[in-house]
Amino acid sequence: MKKILLAIACLWAACISCSEDTKIGAPDEILPDYVLPQGDASKEANDRIQQIFDTYTSYVLYNYTEKDAFWTQTAAGGGVQIYRAIMGESRYVDAMLDYIQDIWLQFFPEEFLKKGGMPYRVFLADSIYLDRGWGKTLYNYRVNGNALIIGGMNEDLTAMDAVTKRTRKNELLGAMWDYYIAQGLLNVPDEFYKDTDYENAPALPLAGENLEAYRKRGFLPTFNSYSGAQEEWYWGDYPWTQAKENDLKSFMLHLRNQTDEEVAWFLNNPEYELIQKKWNILIDYYKKEFDIDLRKIGNTTF
């Protein structure tokens, strides 16, 4: 009997405890990171930005704090280096949206952009620079985590000539391609490396027979990052330790940056069969797997 009474008492206590619990209210509202439209850009521009967000869940921002867009400081030589992004005037937002469409977004399919090809935040800036304390280094873009900052939103944008615009396209797409690889959005087909000998270093391709033998082994030149002139990436023992990476990079630079006319010298040479095979492997792979037309990118000169 005592056990029955004890059980009833415990049950009654539990019921009382439950009845005195505070009721759970509605969950806190999750606020968006940014509110669109942001400011006084044209209605058309704000509508385009809203459409980008609705499609890709990515913010294109022209009204922001510098720290929000990009703020990194590093110690160097006892000083502090700070990256800065300067906002542009909102009257140039329309032209800037056209600009990023022309040099970047048009080359990637919607499904790819939805999966992360469009970074979560894209900041439109007048200019971007590294403040070293004693001077500034200007940049046309910076990739910062899952954000991209693009400079140029100023009066010079609408007057940009075709040569400059092509250079900006090549710079930005090179950076974004590396970003996509790092994020796992793109990869490299193993078939590209299959028939190339990366074990036995060739003779230095300085000129003449050595250069021809080097080409027949399937290697292209690269481009000087400052002058833009073609040069051989294999100039000694060290670059050969990264032969695979250098080989792929040289092909991708030609594929993305050069027109059909500019690459005819190796595509039309019957002696360069391996170069042509590797070339077509990359074109076919990215078109089939990602619907990215590398030759459309290379042939776009504005």
PLM regions and their residue ranges:
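Positively charged n-region of N-terminal signal peptides that target proteins for export
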Residues: 1-4
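C-terminal motif of bacterial Sec signal peptides marking the signal peptidase cleavage site
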Residues: 14-17
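Acidic/polar, low-complexity intrinsically disordered N-terminal segments immediately downstream
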Residues: 19-111, 266-302
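Solvent-exposed, acidic/flexible segments
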Residues: 86-97, 143, 161-170
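Auxiliary, metal-adjacent structural segments of Zn-dependent hydrolase domains
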Residues: 94-146
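Structured domain cores in non-transmembrane regions
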Residues: 131-166, 278-299
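Active-site recognition of the HExxH zinc-binding catalytic motif
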Residues: 148-197
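Metalloprotease/metallohydrolase-associated module, dominated by Zn2+-dependent proteases
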Residues: 199-302
